Regions:
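N-acyltransferase acceptor-side catalytic subdomain
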Residues: 1-141
Length: 141
């Protein structure tokens, strides 16, 4: 297969998926233990992540730094229609100037400000998918 054909085929697949967002629902968890099984699954070979999104690292960071700074867990897990996890956002919630703000766990110490992704979803995610994710999260806030 030539490179142009491979790119064209991949683009066609992505466009077919983009007519409707693939993130059907989100869970927002306030407890790391409740997120651990999905989180560790997204650390597997089918996922895209960095060492800075690993459960063990961020659990330790939250216990030492996050807790001292008054941060609460705000773990977002996005699921497809079969309840298969597509992504996990390891976020922390804080109060700032009267507003609730979320940011990636790790703060200024260790983070690339990114989610853990199912590899296939990450490779083909569209703006429709991400806009849908933001809409679903906003319904929980």
């Amino acid at each position: 297969m030539t490179m142009a054909a491979a790119i064209e085929d991949r683009t066609a697949d992505a466009n077919a998926w983009s007519t409707a967002g693939r993130i059907e629902s989100v869970d927002i968890l306030r407890d790391l233990a409740a997120a651990e099984a999905v989180w560790r699954n997204l650390e597997g070979p089918q996922a895209s992540f960095t060492p800075y999104q690993r459960f063990d690292l961020l659990k330790s960071w939250q216990a030492s730094v996050g807790a001292r700074e008054g941060l609460a867990h705000f773990i977002v897990i996005g699921f497809d229609t079969d309840r298969r996890p597509l992504l996990l956002l390891p976020l922390a919630l804080r109060q700032a100037y009267g507003a609730r703000c979320v940011s990636f766990m790790g703060g200024k110490h260790s983070t690339f400000n990114m989610a853990l992704w199912d590899h296939d979803f990450a490779a083909s995610a569209t703006t429709v998918d991400l806009d849908g994710l933001i809409e679903l999260i906003s319904q929980h806030c």
